[in-house]
């Protein structure tokens, strides 16, 4: 369909191709009356609503139809009387035109345009239009009923219906004489309608402002079309819903007779629809009259009822009434939300004052490693308690044997067999059956005399790093010579040959109250006061790991941070030697080539790993895992990393070698050379305390940096071993054996007080 520009004021009339009348029943023309329809006939509107149009719609249809007829008369188109309401077409944009009459009663024939007229006078067309509008206002009423119209509308229809009788001489109907007498017609009141212009003037005079007539009446016709289409959609949905309900009911109750649903007729639905629209336009107005000047006619039809309601809500043009309950406002509306909350708080039982509250003691929080280190640094060094006998013995150890008070009273009455027995017990590391028998006989001979024993220094206190292997070899050989002695004393002698340093803090030594200390088999019994706590040497692993860090280090110890800096400087120097190879140098400098293997290139899909030590990109094959201290502990010496920082694979491979040696018979230890013994000791090499390595993180380092770190650690630990050896030798020279023979030739002897 081709649409014209405007409705009444003058524009080209639109032409239409009539495809049939609209929906006579809401369900019959559901597809035809969809969103694609642009025009509805007045007869379709009346049939759909099943009630007459209101007065404002009648004013609008009359004004818009006369406007289109006036525009057609200027183009000298033939006139035609309006025979039925089906010829009046209301368009979507608010225009109203006349269609030619249908030959048949059912549907109109196809016509070239909207305005196809035969020769007829203008007054006849106005008269027929007035009659059709009156029938639309009287639609649905009985013959004996008549609708009461407002005086202006009744006068307009009366003038339009009596136009032919009032002016029978004007047969041509041209507007030449009308245009010449235009000023006089504007001054005097229109007593008779002779042209379309007179009808339009009467319609415009109905409004408060005549200049708003075109826009207002166009808006009314546009609203009429929109509301009619919405009603049709509403009725179509209701009918489809009823059909679906019937189908569901038939499926559920197939055996029973189908009962018809109680339906509301279309007329009832249309009546309800009209009532809702009327209430929205007239009755429900959520706005104050005092806020703006109320202009009922031009504004009411500019928007649909829904748009009007939403506009009033957005602009807050409403006043809410106070809801009264039993003649009074409800309590919850009297107070604000803040006051209600305060009243609720006041209604609760009073709270206890803060001073009267007794909170539970906070649970003890486990101290972190950092706090424990700081506490040990701030605390004074605690010395372990020693018995008076040990103090006396340490004093005797500071002078030669000849100056000792115990050996000055040398009145030896002990047989030679006792001395040999003590020597053999010292070599084998345990008491034999002869010692037990001899001790029993001695106690029987002298029951009243109490046995006071002096303890000679053990081999573990005198041997150095070089003499330890020889002593072990000697003890194992002696154990193999005398098969009657058990093999356990040799293990105990080896495990107890190291003494903890005498200046260890008491927190690092185990408490002797927890378990009974084992009696040393190579020492002679002595009595100690019961109120003096005995010192229990720690286990081999803990004593060795702590002993390493207690002796003063007299060599240069590089820290982790310094080694990292040295490695980064070496890497930069290594990069400079590739300057003559521009491609390799550029790729290495930009991080597009692995710095270790220099064969793997990195692309968008192949990412590189960054070595945390030298800060250079490496590939996955050259990247290894290594545990390193974090930033606060980067000042630790590099030798403190030890084997624990190396990769798990290497440490496990290294541990497999000595693990087999531990399961071999003890007698085969004597067959090892010094090289195999050093390999066994490397597995038991001293490590950094595990409690200080809890927060070390596993970092990614390249194979070159890992090798570099391992070499520095091994060299630093060799220097540390030499320093520890010198420290041990310096301490052990302060012994009362000033001119003792070599460790391989020395055999200690112990004598009791009674023997002296």
Swiss-Prot record:
Positions bearing N-acetylalanine: 2
Keyword Membrane: yes
GO biological process: actin cytoskeleton organization; actin filament network formation; actin nucleation; cleavage furrow formation; establishment of meiotic spindle localization; formin-nucleated actin cable assembly; Golgi vesicle transport; innate immune response
KIND domain segment(s): 40-231
Impact noted for substituting residue 138 to N: Abolishes interaction with FMN2
Region: Spir-box, residue numbers: 556-576
Coiled-coil residue windows: 229-257
Membrane topology note: Peripheral membrane protein
UniProt biased composition (Low complexity): 474-492
Modified residues (Phosphothreonine): 509
Keyword Cytoplasm listed: yes
GO terms for MF: actin binding; microtubule binding
Phosphoserine found at: 387, 406, 464-465, 467, 678, 682, 735
Record key words, sorted: Acetylation, Actin-binding, Cell membrane, Coiled coil, Cytoplasm, Cytoplasmic vesicle, Cytoskeleton, Host-virus interaction, Immunity, Innate immunity, Membrane, Phosphoprotein, Protein transport, Repeat, Transport
Family to which the UniProt record says this protein belongs: Belongs to the spire family.
Assembly information from the UniProt record: Interacts with FMN2.
PANTHER family named in the record: PROTEIN SPIRE HOMOLOG 1, SPIRE
Function, in words: Acts as an actin nucleation factor, remains associated with the slow-growing pointed end of the new filament. Involved in intracellular vesicle transport along actin fibers, providing a novel link between actin cytoskeleton dynamics and intracellular transport. Required for asymmetric spindle positioning and asymmetric cell division during meiosis. Required for normal formation of the cleavage furrow and for polar body extrusion during female germ cell meiosis.
Domain note: Binds to actin monomers via the WH2 domain. The Spir-box targets binding to intracellular membrane structures.
Name this polypeptide is given: Protein spire homolog 1
Origin species: Homo sapiens
């Amino acid at each position: 369909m081709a649409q014209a520009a405007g409705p009444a004021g003058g524009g080209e009339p639109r032409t239409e191709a009539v495809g049939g009348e609209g929906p006579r029943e809401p369900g019959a023309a559901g597809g035809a009356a969809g969103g694609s329809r642009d025009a509805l006939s007045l007869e379709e509107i009346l049939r759909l609503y099943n009630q007459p149009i209101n007065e404002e719609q009648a004013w609008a249809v009359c004004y818009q139809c006369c406007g289109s007829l006036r525009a057609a008369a200027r183009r000298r188109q033939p006139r035609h009387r309006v025979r039925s309401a089906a010829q009046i077409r209301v368009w979507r944009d608010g225009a109203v035109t006349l269609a030619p009459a249908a030959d048949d009663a059912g549907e109109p024939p196809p016509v070239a345009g909207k305005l196809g007229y035969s020769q007829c006078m203008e007054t006849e067309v106005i008269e027929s239009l007035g009659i059709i509008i009156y029938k639309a206002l009287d639609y649905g009423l009985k013959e004996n009923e008549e609708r009461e119209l407002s005086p202006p509308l009744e006068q307009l229809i009366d003038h339009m219906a009596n136009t032919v009788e009032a002016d029978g001489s004007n047969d041509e109907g041209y507007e030449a004489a009308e245009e010449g007498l235009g000023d006089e017609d504007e001054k005097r009141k229109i007593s008779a309608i002779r042209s379309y212009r007179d009808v339009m003037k009467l319609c415009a005079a109905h409004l408060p402002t005549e200049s708003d007539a075109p826009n207002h009446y166009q808006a009314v016709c546009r609203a009429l079309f929109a509301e009619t289409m919405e009603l049709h959609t509403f009725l179509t949905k209701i009918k489809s819903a009823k059909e679906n309900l019937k189908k569901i009911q038939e499926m559920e109750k197939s055996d029973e007779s189908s009962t018809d649903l109680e339906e509301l007729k279309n007329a009832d639905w249309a009546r309800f629809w009209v009532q809702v629209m009327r209430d929205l336009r007239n009755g429900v107005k959520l706005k104050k009259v005092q806020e703006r000047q109320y202009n009922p006619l031009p504004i009411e039809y500019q928007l649909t009822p829904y748009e009007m309601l939403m506009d009033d809500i957005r602009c807050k043009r409403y006043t809410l009434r106070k809801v009264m309950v039993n003649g009074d406002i409800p309590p919850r509306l009297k107070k604000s939300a803040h006051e209600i909350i305060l009243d609720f708080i006041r209604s609760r039982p009073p709270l206890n004052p803060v001073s009267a509250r007794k909170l539970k003691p906070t649970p003890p929080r486990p101290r972190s490693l950092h706090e424990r280190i700081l506490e040990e640094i701030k605390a004074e060094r605690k010395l372990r308690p020693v018995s008076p006998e040990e103090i006396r013995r340490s004093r005797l150890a500071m002078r030669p044997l000849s100056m000792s008070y115990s050996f000055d009273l040398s009145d030896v009455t002990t047989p030679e067999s006792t001395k040999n027995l003590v020597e053999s017990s010292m070599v084998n590391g345990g008491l034999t059956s002869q010692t037990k028998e001899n001790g029993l006989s001695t106690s029987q001979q002298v029951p009243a005399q109490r046995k006071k024993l002096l303890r000679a220094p053990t081999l573990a206190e005198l041997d150095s790093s070089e003499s330890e292997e020889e002593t072990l070899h000697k003890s194992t050989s002696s154990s193999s010579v005398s098969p009657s002695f058990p093999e356990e004393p040799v293990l105990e002698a080896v495990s107890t040959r190291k003494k903890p340093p005498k200046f260890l803090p008491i927190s690092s030594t185990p408490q002797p109250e927890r378990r009974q200390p084992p009696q040393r088999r190579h020492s002679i019994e002595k009595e100690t006061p019961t109120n003096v706590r005995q010192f229990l040497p720690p286990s081999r692993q803990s004593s060795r790991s702590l002993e390493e860090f207690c002796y003063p280090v007299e060599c240069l110890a590089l820290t982790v941070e310094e080694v990292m800096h040295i490695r980064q400087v070496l890497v930069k120097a290594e990069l400079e030697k590739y300057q003559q190879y521009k491609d390799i140098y550029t790729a290495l400098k930009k991080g597009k080539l692995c710095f270790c293997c220099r064969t793997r290139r990195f692309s968008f899909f192949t990412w590189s790993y960054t070595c945390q030590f030298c800060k250079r990109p490496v590939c996955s094959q050259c990247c290894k895992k290594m545990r390193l201290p974090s930033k606060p502990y980067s000042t630790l010496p590099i030798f403190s990393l030890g084997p624990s920082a190396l990769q798990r694979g290497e440490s496990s491979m290294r541990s497999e070698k000595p693990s087999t040696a531990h399961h071999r018979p003890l007698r085969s230890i004597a067959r090892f050379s010094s090289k195999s013994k050093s390999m066994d000791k490397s597995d038991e090499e001293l490590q950094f305390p595990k409690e200080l390595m809890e927060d070390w993180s596993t970092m990614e380092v390249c194979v070159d940096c890992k090798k570099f770190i391992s070499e520095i650690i091994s060299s630093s630990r060799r220097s540390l071993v030499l320093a520890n050896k010198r420290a041990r030798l310096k301490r052990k020279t302060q012994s009362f054996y000033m001119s003792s023979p070599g460790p391989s030739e020395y055999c200690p002897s112990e004598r009791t007080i009674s023997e002296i």
